[in-house]
């Protein structure tokens, strides 16, 4: 990583841990973020099923299909969680839009945190 480049894991960690009642622990060998210590809302995917760096997150109904159709270079249907509508977001693309990722993570958090 060159000077000035953002470490994707560290930036994602900052975004997730800034939200209320969020904790981090390893799940299936990957950093994963939980709401109130129980429900996963984001999991890091460091070359989990392919050669890509990404994260998987909860998403509002219909968001996965719309985002993957609109930009398959940046978004995908993740294994395991994709069937539940979760969204995969590639972090190894040029010019990662961290403001957009903050919004995606906030939406993921809301999907899980609002379920009590």
Go through each PLM region and give its residues.
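Charge-dense, helix-prone N-terminal extensions
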Residues: 1-116
